[in-house]
C-alpha cells in the first residue's frame, strides 16, 4: 500500500504556524540563485508560496558568477534581518558546492549543507541536518520505532544517503544501517534482509518487487521525469507488497516543511 503521510504533514504545518505566531517579527528566508533554469525557477516559486503560507518573508537574490557568491553570501550571513539562506543549483562552473556552502553562516544554513552542520551529526548534535535526510527520518519515526531495525540506505550523496545513515545511528534512534551504492554487489540480497529500505539513487523505477520482501517499509526519495510524469526510484507496483511512500506527494512534501521549520528555528535561535 502507499503510505499516507497526511497526519504527519498536518501536524508539522500546525507546529510551524504556532511557532511563527510566537515570534515578535516574521522570519526571513533568502534564496540565492546563480544560473537558474526552468526547474529552478519553478522550485523557487514553490518555496515562496510555502513561505507566504506560514507568514515567512521570502526574497530571492541573484549571483550569476562565483565572485558574486563570494561577496553576497557572507553579506547575507552578516545581515541580522536574515534568518535562513539556501542556495540553488546549478552553480557557476568555477566554484565547488563545498566552497559555496561554506560561505554561508552555519546558523543560517537551513539546508544543512555547511561542513559544520554535517559534522555536528557525527557528534549526535544535529542543528540543521540536510532537509531531505531529516524528512526521511521524520517519516520513519512516524511509521515505526527504528531502534534495532535493519535499515538499508541506497545512495551515498552528501545531502541524503550519508547524513541519513548518521542520523539513523544516533543514540536514541539506534538503527542498524547498511549503505549501498552503484558498486554494491547483490543489493537485492541486502534489501530483502532489511526492515526498512530508503532509495535515493536517481534512477527512475529502478527497484521493483524483486528487491523487497513483503511488508518492508520503502521510502522513495527519487524524483525523476519520465515523459510527462514525475516518478520515483521505486516502481509503484512495489506498493502491492510493501508500504511505499508515493512520488510525488511523499518525501518531497515533508522536505519542504523541514526547510520552513529550519527557518523558524534559525529565527528562534537568533533571539537567544
UniProtKB/Swiss-Prot annotation:
Q: Name one GO cellular component term.
A: cytosol
Residue sites binding NADP(+) per the record: 155-157, 182, 223
Task: Cite the annotated pathway.
Answer: One-carbon metabolism; tetrahydrofolate interconversion
Q: Name one GO molecular function term.
A: methylenetetrahydrofolate dehydrogenase (NADP+) activity
Kindly state which reaction or reactions the protein catalyses.
(6R)-5,10-methylene-5,6,7,8-tetrahydrofolate + NADP(+) = (6R)-5,10-methenyltetrahydrofolate + NADPH; (6R)-5,10-methenyltetrahydrofolate + H2O = (6R)-10-formyltetrahydrofolate + H(+)
Q: What is its EC number?
A: 1.5.1.5, 3.5.4.9
* Family matches, as InterPro entries: Aminoacid_DH-like_N_sf (IPR046346), NAD(P)-bd_dom_sf (IPR036291), THF_DH/CycHdrlase (IPR000672), THF_DH/CycHdrlase_cat_dom (IPR020630), THF_DH/CycHdrlase_NAD-bd_dom (IPR020631)
Any GO BP annotation: purine nucleotide biosynthetic process
Q: Check the record and name the SUPFAM superfamilies matching this protein.
A: Aminoacid dehydrogenase-like, N-terminal domain, NAD(P)-binding Rossmann-fold domains
Q: Which domain of life is it from?
A: Bacteria
Q: Which UniProt keywords apply?
A: Amino-acid biosynthesis, Histidine biosynthesis, Hydrolase, Methionine biosynthesis, Multifunctional enzyme, NADP, One-carbon metabolism, Oxidoreductase, Purine biosynthesis
One Pfam family matching this protein? THF_DHG_CYH_C
HAMAP family for this protein: THF_DHG_CYH
- Write out the function statement from the record: Catalyzes the oxidation of 5,10-methylenetetrahydrofolate to 5,10-methenyltetrahydrofolate and then the hydrolysis of 5,10-methenyltetrahydrofolate to 10-formyltetrahydrofolate.
Describe its assembly.
Homodimer.
Family from the record? Belongs to the tetrahydrofolate dehydrogenase/cyclohydrolase family.
Task: Quote the protein name from its UniProt record.
Answer: Bifunctional protein FolD
**Organism phylogeny:** Bacteria, Thermotogati, Thermotogota, Thermotogae, Thermotogales
Q: Encoded by which gene?
A: folD
